[in-house]
Amino acid sequence: MGNVIVVTSGKGGVGKTTITANLGCALAKLGEKVCLIDADIGLKNLDIVLGLENRIVYTMIDVVNGKVSPQEALVKHKMLKNLYLLPASQIATKEMISPNDMKAIVKELIPHFDYIIIDSPAGIERGFRNAVAPAERVLVVTTPELPAISDADRVIGLLENFGFSDEKINVIINRFKPHMVKKGEMLTTDDIKHTLSLEIIAVIPDSEDIIVASNTGIPVSLNGNSRISKNFENLARRIRGEGVPLENDFVTVSKGLIDTLKDFFSKLKRG
């Protein structure tokens, strides 16, 4: 499994940046040295989610222009000393960076980190191509609605055209609502797996804790009182190759839904 990972999605608003931040924090909590790269030039948010917006001195554009090296532009996280961010510029455009620029930046950083995680812009334009250029593995974030699944499927097709095998692409289902699934009002994990024909690596239930965390600049992964932080730890452990069952992502689900979810997962395994 590659250690350069891009987190992408077919559309905006599915929680991609939040997942990037929390995955980075979860890996760092497990002792990994992690660099997060915000590749969403002009629309950067990763620094805000991490609570680092006031600590930025240099951005990726400064690196591309030769003003500083990639390492000189990094911002160290306040709470996790083995987590770093390479920020995006708010005033630049995606056309100011090329796929080769991204490859060069990652090539210089990778010897110093266990994992590099790139937050890709949503969609399939230039910024997306920049973000996936140096990646060895892809996490596609979607929510359990048909429009989001359709957009994710389109991105997966592009990734396959870029040479990514199915083994290098995994799906994260975000904002999953088990009570709606139980009533037949939301797609199941089984539905999504069969539609996208890819393995699901994590399910993140809908949680108010994530909204609160985004507004405070402290990722929910760092909140020991939030049960949803365990979901991101599960994801981080799977990224490291640990065999954490997908069922473990539902430890926060009410007891009344357990039988329903077990049925979904038994179908998923048979599929």
UniProtKB/Swiss-Prot annotation:
Keyword Ribonucleoprotein (UniProt): no
Residues the entry annotates as binding ATP: 11-18
Major place of residence: membrane
Source organism superkingdom: Bacteria
Membrane protein topology class: Peripheral membrane protein
Subcellular location field: Cell membrane
CDD domains per the UniProt record, alphabetical: MinD
Cellular component, GO annotation: cytoplasmic side of plasma membrane; cytosol
A molecular function GO annotation: ATP binding
Record key words, sorted: ATP-binding, Cell cycle, Cell division, Cell membrane, Membrane, Nucleotide-binding, Septation
Pfam families in the record: CbiA
Signal peptide stretch: none
Residue ranges of coiled coil: none
Example GO biological process: division septum assembly
Function of the molecule: ATPase required for the correct placement of the division site. Cell division inhibitors MinC and MinD act in concert to form an inhibitor capable of blocking formation of the polar Z ring septums. Rapidly oscillates between the poles of the cell to destabilize FtsZ filaments that have formed before they mature into polar Z rings.
Subunit architecture: Interacts with MinC and FtsZ.
Annotated PANTHER family: SEPTUM SITE-DETERMINING PROTEIN MIND HOMOLOG, CHLOROPLASTIC (PTHR43384:SF6), SEPTUM SITE-DETERMINING PROTEIN MIND HOMOLOG, CHLOROPLASTIC-RELATED (PTHR43384)
Family to which the UniProt record says this protein belongs: Belongs to the ParA family. MinD subfamily.
Protein's name in the database: Septum site-determining protein MinD
Gene name of the encoded protein: minD
